[in-house]
Design a protein with these regions (language model features):
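Extracytoplasmic/secreted envelope proteins and their assembly/folding machinery
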Residues: 53-56, 63, 67, 71-74, ...
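Soluble non-cytosolic domains of exported or imported proteins
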Residues: 60-61, 104, 121-125, 145-152, ...
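Extracytoplasmic substrate-binding proteins
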Residues: 133-200
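A short, structured surface patch at a secondary-structure boundary
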Residues: 58-112
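Short, acidic/turn-prone active-site loops that include or flank metal/cofactor-
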Residues: 82-86, 124-125, 141-146
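Bacterial Sec-exported substrate-binding components of ABC uptake systems
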Residues: 2-7, 17-64, 166-195, 255-260
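Binding-cleft/active-site segments that stabilize strongly anionic ligands or cofactors
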Residues: 92-140, 186, 191, 197-260
Length: 260
């Protein structure tokens, strides 16, 4: 130990052991409270407002949408689920500790990682109660019927937590510009149908569903069928149905390619 640092350390220890006048104790308590307050912030979640650590270093994520957003914001995620087939997220999965799957968290692995904050949402939020017993946990599930606005709100929340507000504002401006361009391009171009394909099964999604709400709402492409189901994994349909409706545009999500 260098002499100067040694004497400084001794001075700090002596000061800590010395009795404080009542007034100084009050000031010290107020300073500690202010410091603790500065280290946390209150953010909106799907379960109401929550107090979270500000700019936590050890973060575990059980929501792929949040993982995508955090990666785009340049936030390091130390732990997440087993990999999924999203090419640009593979570097994240390779570096991060695996703490289970979206539907089955590995609580032993999570405890070993010792996160300061756990972020969940969507299907992963089913494990919220148990996750919250292990660490501070927030549910950032987006509103399926309002994906764009809800997604931007999620991005804003994450940006506040990690001090990335400026970057988030730039991303929002880019997103807004893309939506405006696409909405203009879609005007008068017919009607659309959003489908999900799993093997030989085909499902169609309603205007307020998780896969179609932004296409029909934010882009403004009219649907070929207003009666389609909005909940869950869509409404099973046949090829005859598709032929009968005869959409001008078909948007297909290949679920088999995504999850295997």
């Amino acid at each position: 130990m260098k002499p100067r640092f040694y004497w400084a350390a001794c001075a700090v220890l002596l000061a800590a052991c010395s009795p404080e006048p009542a007034a100084e104790k009050t000031v010290s308590a107020e300073s500690q409270t202010a410091s603790a307050s500065a280290a946390t912030l209150t953010v909106p979640t799907a379960r109401g407002d929550a107090v979270v650590p500000k700019n936590p270093e050890r973060v575990a994520v059980y929501d792929w949408a949040a993982l995508d957003t955090l990666t785009e914001l340049g936030v390091n995620v130390g732990a997440t689920t087993a990999p999924v087939r999203v090419d640009y997220l593979q570097p994240v999965f390779e570096k991060a500790a695996t703490v289970g799957t979206l539907f089955e968290p590995d609580y032993e692995a999570l405890n070993r990682y010792n996160p300061q904050l756990v972020i969940t949402g969507g299907p992963g939020a089913e494990a919220y109660e148990q996750l919250a017993k292990n660490a501070t946990t927030i549910d950032l599930t987006v509103d399926n019927g309002n994906i764009r606005t809800s997604g931007e709100k999620q991005m804003g929340t994450l940006a506040r937590i990690f001090g990335k507000e400026a970057h988030a504002a730039e991303l929002k401006a880019q997103i807004d510009a893309l939506f405006a361009q696409t909405r203009e391009a879609a005007k008068g171009k017919g009607r659309g149908l959003v489908l999900s394909v799993t093997g030989n099964k085909v499902s169609a999604f309603g205007t307020q569903s998780r896969l179609a709400s932004w296409i029909h709402g934010d882009i403004g492409l009219p649907p070929v069928d207003e009666s389609l189901r909005n909940e869950g994994h869509g409404q099973p349909v046949s090829f005859e149905y598709i032929k009968e409706k005869n959409p001008d545009w078909i948007f297909i999500i290949d679920r088999t390619a995504a999850i295997g």
